[in-house]
């Protein structure tokens, strides 16, 4: 009986250590992209397994609205949170986080990975539209061109991964007027009055440019404001 009790205690301790290992492993992976396989799809969340068989959760609200996955599909997502629930590691993934888009750019654009180009800000309405502000520390590198690639070669893969999310890459600048002008692209701006005290800007443009500035469903102006 004492041998059996010892064996049970040992098994429980090993299981506990394994859980701690998974927790610590993923705690270090927060903000990183992982590849997994869809194991189960429920109404409110999806169960994903990594290559070691660890269970990861992708909640519905962290999925792009047009995402459609079935059991056995490969899936790419970013780790956003790791918790312990009832002594079990609970690893939460996201495909809607701006960090996911940032990491996709790092994977596709060597200049970002190497630190020659910095992503200053990312704002997105998942599956619809995103704006990414980038800056280069080397005058010889065009940060926007490097991110888009020849004939869009670098950005196409990212757009596909994000279910055809429309991505605007803009050149970051400390010049507020120029930054606002670029953020509101493709609308052509005539004049900008900046109210520093209230952190507001009045933007003037020709009547035919207004709908472009606002964008479909107000997305362009919403994202420009967030940027």
Short names for language-model regions:
Residues 1-227:
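RNA-contacting regions in translation and RNA-metabolism proteins
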